[in-house]
């Protein structure tokens, strides 16, 4: 076959392929814009036709789709179609309807499948399977159980303070999110497995850990647009990964560490029993308990335990640590807030009096700081989709068909000026009156709400109350080269990210006057 015959064959073939592609795209556009069951819901036409609209803002513009969604609500109203299949609602009064405690709610595979933890309760799509999976682990995070692990939390705070003492003596600046992530990681792993990761026992702690969870969720977010890309990249080896997407290396290392920990528990259950005798609290640990029940509970497999381990460790570290970071910045950035917090703590706990969780929870100003920190750290800043599997949802006069993913965003709810005036300001007094706190708590959605609410909420509150109180009772801190831009939401990569180039919240420490 000569070149002329090849050209004569390929030329009409390419034109035919091009024509078929054009017809397909036009047909798809007509279908999505006019024939889709969501065609009656307002929104940009391009978003209704293709996920490339979302891809542009979240991947190319690095986590800016949440901000674009806010603009779309200003243009189209409280309900907007943001993709071919998904609706977004920005109305705080609808939150408890969507995130219901009683009505069945499934999760959207678009949100969960790319984290590769399908066996975890967090990633379980169907509500019928989610209920027993959550019920298996929920008792370990109940308020009464968390109250009993105060010695473990206090032990980790003591270790954290030993590290901070070294920084204070040396006059070295501390990047607080590094310290706080190591603290929360050791708490969650010490409680759930008897075998803490030990980051607080490492000199200078483990700086890479504070980035690992962020990298994990960022990769999961990008991977849904590029299925197969990261598994393929992971198979090429460390050198290629370092050149193409180095953040993947820390995620692979984290997963390998989790596999090793779970495999050890699975193959050495007797060691878990021995570890329990030396643990910092007497409460049964979640993962050794699951392993011990595997022989009588078919749903408990090594893969299931691994997926729960990855999810609980990841979810139980960065979000709480980020809230502590936000609290730290705003306390230090406003001398009046620091003065009032110190006065409240010194009044209730004079001298070396022991601070217990139950008493700390009754302190109105400390509570205001914790709640305001949660409000401005958002939990997951990304929208959380829920699906009504059988019944249509009705928002005002708009009917949303069953099996439609519907999302709402804490980053939008927490900045609703009709509920939180001066919403970008850190104002603990919003929460100090107990009746006002009860009213506002309806709109505090950092832990989400409903049947899939964050399972670790009680543990997070305990860590926040105990750690914030202890740190500001003992240390004077001074911000160094840090501004509000270092804690302000600039991009939403599921977790809130500050502006590009931010070095985080850095402080210089010294013992507080009158401190320990």
Swiss-Prot record:
One example GO MF annotation: oxidoreductase activity, acting on paired donors, with incorporation or reduction of molecular oxygen
Q: EC number(s) per UniProt?
A: 1.14.14.-
Binding locations of heme: 454
Q: What is its main location?
A: membrane
Q: Which GO terms describe its cellular component?
A: membrane
**Gene3D superfamilies xref list:** Cytochrome P450 (1.10.630.10)
Catalyzed chemical reaction(s): 7-methylmellein + 3 reduced [NADPH--hemoprotein reductase] + 3 O2 = 7-carboxymellein + 3 oxidized [NADPH--hemoprotein reductase] + 4 H2O + 4 H(+)
The entry's localization annotation reads:
Membrane
What role does it serve in industrial or biotechnological applications?
A: Stilbenes such as resveratrol, piceatannol and pterostilbene affect the expression of the OTA cluster to reduce ochratoxin A and B production and thus could be used as naturally safe and efficient compounds in food active packaging or preservatives against ochratoxin A in food. Pterostilbene with methoxy groups demonstrated greater inhibitory and antitoxic activity than resveratrol and piceatannol.
Protein's job: Cytochrome P450 monooxygenase; part of the gene cluster that mediates the biosynthesis of ochratoxin A (OTA), a mycotoxin composed of a chlorinated type I polyketide dihydroisocoumarin moiety linked to L-phenylalanine, and demonstrated to have nephrotoxic, immunotoxic, genotoxic, neurotoxic, and teratogenic properties. OtaC catalyzes the oxidation of 7-methylmellein (7-MM) into 7-carboxymellein.
User: What is the protein's given name?
Assistant: Cytochrome P450 monooxygenase otaC
What is the organism field in this record? Aspergillus carbonarius (strain ITEM 5010)
Q: Provide the organism lineage as a comma list.
A: Eukaryota, Fungi, Dikarya, Ascomycota, Pezizomycotina
